[in-house]
Protein backbone atom coordinates (compact mmCIF):
# COMPACT_ATOMS: atom_id res chain seq x y z
CA UNK A 1 0.00 0.00 0.00
CA UNK A 2 1.31 3.44 -0.98
CA UNK A 3 0.55 6.79 0.69
CA UNK A 4 1.47 10.38 -0.06
CA UNK A 5 4.48 12.02 1.56
CA UNK A 6 3.96 15.70 2.39
CA UNK A 7 6.49 18.51 2.53
CA UNK A 8 6.57 20.94 5.44
CA UNK A 9 4.55 23.45 3.41
CA UNK A 10 1.77 20.91 2.82
CA UNK A 11 2.61 20.12 -0.80
CA UNK A 12 2.94 16.54 -2.00
CA UNK A 13 6.49 15.26 -2.30
CA UNK A 14 5.67 11.84 -3.72
CA UNK A 15 4.61 8.37 -2.63
CA UNK A 16 6.05 5.92 -0.14
CA UNK A 17 5.32 2.22 0.21
CA UNK A 18 4.04 1.34 3.66
CA UNK A 19 5.31 -1.73 5.51
CA UNK A 20 2.96 -4.69 5.74
CA UNK A 21 2.46 -3.94 9.45
CA UNK A 22 -0.01 -1.20 8.50
CA UNK A 23 -2.35 -3.90 7.23
CA UNK A 24 -2.20 -6.06 10.37
CA UNK A 25 -5.34 -7.46 11.98
CA UNK A 26 -7.05 -5.20 14.52
CA UNK A 27 -6.87 -6.96 17.90
CA UNK A 28 -8.09 -4.68 20.72
CA UNK A 29 -7.74 -7.53 23.22
CA UNK A 30 -4.00 -7.87 22.54
CA UNK A 31 -3.51 -4.11 22.55
CA UNK A 32 -5.15 -3.86 25.97
CA UNK A 33 -2.93 -6.59 27.42
CA UNK A 34 0.24 -5.03 26.00
CA UNK A 35 -0.57 -1.58 27.40
CA UNK A 36 -1.50 -2.94 30.82
CA UNK A 37 1.75 -4.93 30.79
CA UNK A 38 3.72 -1.72 30.19
CA UNK A 39 1.82 0.14 32.90
CA UNK A 40 2.19 -2.55 35.55
CA UNK A 41 5.90 -2.93 34.80
CA UNK A 42 6.36 0.39 36.62
CA UNK A 43 4.86 -0.97 39.85
CA UNK A 44 6.91 -2.43 42.67
CA UNK A 45 5.92 -4.99 45.32
CA UNK A 46 5.15 -3.55 48.72
CA UNK A 47 4.56 -5.09 52.12
CA UNK A 48 4.70 -4.29 55.81
CA UNK A 49 7.01 -5.17 58.67
CA UNK A 50 6.32 -8.76 59.73
CA UNK A 51 6.28 -7.68 63.40
CA UNK A 52 4.32 -4.44 62.97
CA UNK A 53 1.89 -4.13 65.90
CA UNK A 54 3.30 -7.24 67.57
CA UNK A 55 6.00 -5.52 69.63
CA UNK A 56 4.09 -5.42 72.88
CA UNK A 57 3.97 -7.30 76.17
CA UNK A 58 0.16 -7.40 76.08
CA UNK A 59 -1.45 -10.72 77.02
CA UNK A 60 -4.93 -12.16 76.80
CA UNK A 61 -6.64 -12.92 80.13
CA UNK A 62 -8.96 -15.41 78.45
CA UNK A 63 -12.70 -15.84 78.79
CA UNK A 64 -14.97 -15.52 81.77
CA UNK A 65 -14.21 -11.93 82.74
CA UNK A 66 -17.14 -10.20 81.06
CA UNK A 67 -15.05 -8.24 78.58
CA UNK A 68 -13.60 -8.68 75.13
CA UNK A 69 -10.85 -11.28 74.89
CA UNK A 70 -8.30 -8.95 73.31
CA UNK A 71 -4.74 -8.81 74.48
CA UNK A 72 -4.26 -6.10 77.08
CA UNK A 73 -1.35 -4.27 78.59
CA UNK A 74 -0.72 -4.17 82.31
CA UNK A 75 -2.79 -0.98 82.48
CA UNK A 76 -5.73 -2.70 80.79
CA UNK A 77 -5.50 -0.97 77.38
CA UNK A 78 -6.17 -3.15 74.34
CA UNK A 79 -3.24 -3.92 72.04
CA UNK A 80 -2.11 -6.14 69.17
CA UNK A 81 -5.48 -6.29 67.40
CA UNK A 82 -6.41 -4.08 64.39
CA UNK A 83 -9.00 -2.02 66.28
CA UNK A 84 -6.53 -1.06 69.04
CA UNK A 85 -4.23 1.94 68.99
CA UNK A 86 -0.80 0.78 67.83
CA UNK A 87 -2.14 -2.58 66.71
CA UNK A 88 -1.44 -4.38 63.46
CA UNK A 89 -3.31 -3.69 60.22
CA UNK A 90 -6.21 -5.97 59.40
CA UNK A 91 -5.20 -6.75 55.82
CA UNK A 92 -1.78 -5.24 55.10
CA UNK A 93 -0.28 -5.17 51.59
CA UNK A 94 1.39 -8.45 50.69
CA UNK A 95 4.64 -8.81 48.77
CA UNK A 96 3.23 -11.99 47.20
CA UNK A 97 0.45 -10.10 45.42
CA UNK A 98 0.68 -10.45 41.64
CA UNK A 99 0.95 -6.91 40.27
CA UNK A 100 2.23 -7.53 36.77
CA UNK A 101 0.43 -8.41 33.55
CA UNK A 102 2.78 -10.82 31.84
CA UNK A 103 2.81 -11.03 28.06
CA UNK A 104 4.81 -13.06 25.57
CA UNK A 105 7.38 -11.28 23.40
CA UNK A 106 5.73 -12.26 20.11
CA UNK A 107 2.31 -11.42 21.51
CA UNK A 108 3.55 -7.96 22.50
CA UNK A 109 4.98 -7.39 19.02
CA UNK A 110 1.70 -8.47 17.45
CA UNK A 111 -0.15 -6.03 19.71
CA UNK A 112 2.11 -3.20 18.53
CA UNK A 113 1.50 -4.17 14.90
CA UNK A 114 -2.24 -4.12 15.52
CA UNK A 115 -2.05 -0.69 17.18
CA UNK A 116 -0.02 0.71 14.27
CA UNK A 117 -2.58 -0.60 11.79
CA UNK A 118 -5.40 0.93 13.86
CA UNK A 119 -3.71 4.35 13.70
CA UNK A 120 -4.15 4.23 9.91
CA UNK A 121 -7.89 3.56 10.12
CA UNK A 122 -9.89 6.84 10.00
CA UNK A 123 -12.93 5.27 11.69
CA UNK A 124 -10.94 4.05 14.69
CA UNK A 125 -8.99 7.32 14.95
CA UNK A 126 -12.18 9.38 14.82
CA UNK A 127 -13.92 7.09 17.35
CA UNK A 128 -11.08 7.77 19.78
CA UNK A 129 -12.08 11.44 19.73
CA UNK A 130 -9.44 12.95 17.46
CA UNK A 131 -10.33 15.83 15.11
CA UNK A 132 -9.27 14.62 11.67
CA UNK A 133 -11.38 16.84 9.43
CA UNK A 134 -9.11 18.15 6.68
CA UNK A 135 -6.17 15.87 7.52
CA UNK A 136 -4.74 14.92 4.08
CA UNK A 137 -4.38 11.18 4.69
CA UNK A 138 -3.99 8.46 7.27
CA UNK A 139 -1.36 7.36 7.96
CA UNK A 140 0.13 10.84 7.69
CA UNK A 141 3.75 10.79 6.48
CA UNK A 142 5.88 13.92 6.36
CA UNK A 143 9.22 14.75 4.78
CA UNK A 144 12.34 13.76 6.76
CA UNK A 145 13.18 17.48 6.97
CA UNK A 146 10.69 17.62 9.85
CA UNK A 147 13.32 16.03 12.11
CA UNK A 148 15.61 19.06 11.68
CA UNK A 149 13.09 21.56 13.08
CA UNK A 150 14.39 23.34 16.18
CA UNK A 151 11.63 25.75 17.23
CA UNK A 152 8.24 24.82 18.63
CA UNK A 153 6.61 27.53 16.51
CA UNK A 154 8.05 25.85 13.38
CA UNK A 155 6.50 22.53 14.40
CA UNK A 156 3.20 24.28 15.10
CA UNK A 157 3.23 25.81 11.61
CA UNK A 158 3.67 22.35 10.09
CA UNK A 159 0.78 21.04 12.20
CA UNK A 160 -1.42 23.89 11.01
CA UNK A 161 -0.46 23.21 7.40
CA UNK A 162 -1.39 19.53 7.78
CA UNK A 163 -4.68 20.42 9.54
CA UNK A 164 -3.60 18.91 12.86
CA UNK A 165 -4.15 22.13 14.81
CA UNK A 166 -7.82 21.32 15.50
CA UNK A 167 -6.80 18.26 17.49
CA UNK A 168 -4.20 20.30 19.39
CA UNK A 169 -6.93 22.74 20.39
CA UNK A 170 -9.11 19.84 21.52
CA UNK A 171 -6.32 18.62 23.80
CA UNK A 172 -5.54 22.10 25.08
CA UNK A 173 -9.17 22.86 25.90
CA UNK A 174 -9.60 19.46 27.54
CA UNK A 175 -7.06 20.06 30.31
CA UNK A 176 -8.91 20.11 33.62
CA UNK A 177 -8.26 19.65 37.31
CA UNK A 178 -8.68 16.08 38.47
CA UNK A 179 -11.41 15.26 40.95
CA UNK A 180 -10.41 13.60 44.20
CA UNK A 181 -7.21 13.06 46.15
CA UNK A 182 -5.08 12.65 43.05
CA UNK A 183 -4.62 16.42 43.09
CA UNK A 184 -2.38 15.98 46.13
CA UNK A 185 -0.41 13.10 44.64
CA UNK A 186 1.39 14.67 41.73
CA UNK A 187 -1.35 14.26 39.11
CA UNK A 188 -3.39 17.43 39.52
CA UNK A 189 -4.39 17.81 35.86
CA UNK A 190 -6.09 15.48 33.40
CA UNK A 191 -4.43 16.05 30.03
CA UNK A 192 -5.95 14.57 26.85
CA UNK A 193 -3.62 12.95 24.33
CA UNK A 194 -3.25 14.55 20.92
CA UNK A 195 -0.80 13.88 18.07
CA UNK A 196 1.94 11.27 18.41
CA UNK A 197 5.03 12.14 16.37
CA UNK A 198 7.21 9.18 15.39
CA UNK A 199 10.72 10.07 14.19
CA UNK A 200 13.55 7.91 12.91
CA UNK A 201 16.27 8.72 15.45
CA UNK A 202 16.97 11.20 18.24
CA UNK A 203 16.75 14.68 16.71
CA UNK A 204 15.99 18.34 17.38
CA UNK A 205 12.30 17.87 16.61
CA UNK A 206 11.83 15.86 19.81
CA UNK A 207 12.40 18.85 22.08
CA UNK A 208 10.67 21.18 19.61
CA UNK A 209 7.44 19.14 19.55
CA UNK A 210 6.91 17.88 23.08
CA UNK A 211 5.88 21.25 24.56
CA UNK A 212 2.66 21.33 22.53
CA UNK A 213 -0.49 20.33 24.40
CA UNK A 214 -1.11 16.59 24.24
CA UNK A 215 1.77 15.93 21.81
CA UNK A 216 4.23 13.09 22.45
CA UNK A 217 7.36 12.30 20.44
CA UNK A 218 9.04 8.90 20.22
CA UNK A 219 11.63 7.25 18.01
CA UNK A 220 10.56 4.34 15.83
CA UNK A 221 12.78 1.88 17.70
CA UNK A 222 11.29 2.88 21.08
CA UNK A 223 7.68 2.86 19.89
CA UNK A 224 5.41 0.53 21.87
CA UNK A 225 1.70 -0.05 22.34
CA UNK A 226 1.51 2.31 25.32
CA UNK A 227 2.53 5.24 23.08
CA UNK A 228 0.27 4.59 20.11
CA UNK A 229 -2.68 3.26 22.15
CA UNK A 230 -2.63 5.18 25.46
CA UNK A 231 -5.24 4.09 27.96
CA UNK A 232 -5.57 0.80 26.01
CA UNK A 233 -7.57 2.71 23.34
CA UNK A 234 -6.13 2.20 19.86
CA UNK A 235 -6.37 4.74 17.05
CA UNK A 236 -4.13 7.60 18.15
CA UNK A 237 -3.60 10.32 15.56
CA UNK A 238 0.00 9.77 14.45
CA UNK A 239 2.45 11.74 12.33
CA UNK A 240 5.26 9.67 10.80
CA UNK A 241 8.47 10.86 9.21
CA UNK A 242 9.98 9.06 6.23
CA UNK A 243 12.85 7.81 8.37
CA UNK A 244 10.40 6.42 10.93
CA UNK A 245 8.61 4.40 8.25
CA UNK A 246 11.92 2.84 7.20
CA UNK A 247 12.81 2.02 10.82
CA UNK A 248 9.40 0.45 11.48
CA UNK A 249 9.83 -1.69 8.39
CA UNK A 250 13.02 -3.06 9.94
CA UNK A 251 11.27 -4.03 13.18
CA UNK A 252 8.65 -6.27 11.56
UniProtKB/Swiss-Prot annotation:
Statement: the UniProt record of this protein carries the keyword rRNA-binding: yes
One protein family per Pfam: Ribosomal_L4
UniProt GO cellular component terms: ribonucleoprotein complex; ribosome
Entry keywords, A to Z: Ribonucleoprotein, Ribosomal protein, RNA-binding, rRNA-binding
Gene Ontology BP annotations: translation
GO molecular function: rRNA binding; structural constituent of ribosome
Highest rank taxon of the organism: Archaea
rRNA-binding in keyword set: yes
Family under the similarity heading: Belongs to the universal ribosomal protein uL4 family.
Protein role: One of the primary rRNA binding proteins, this protein initially binds near the 5'-end of the 23S rRNA. It is important during the early stages of 50S assembly. It makes multiple contacts with different domains of the 23S rRNA in the assembled 50S subunit and ribosome. Forms part of the polypeptide exit tunnel.
Assembly and binders: Part of the 50S ribosomal subunit.
Stored HAMAP family: Ribosomal_uL4_A (MF_01328_A)
Protein name: Large ribosomal subunit protein uL4
Gene that this sequence comes from: rpl4
Amino acid sequence: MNVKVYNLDGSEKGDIELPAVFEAEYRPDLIKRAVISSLTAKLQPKGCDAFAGYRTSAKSIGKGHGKARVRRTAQGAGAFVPQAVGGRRAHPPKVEKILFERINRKEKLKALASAIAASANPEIVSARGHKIEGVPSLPLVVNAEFESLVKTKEVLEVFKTLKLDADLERAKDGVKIRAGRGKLRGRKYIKPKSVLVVVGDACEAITASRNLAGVDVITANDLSAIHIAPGTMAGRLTLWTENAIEKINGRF
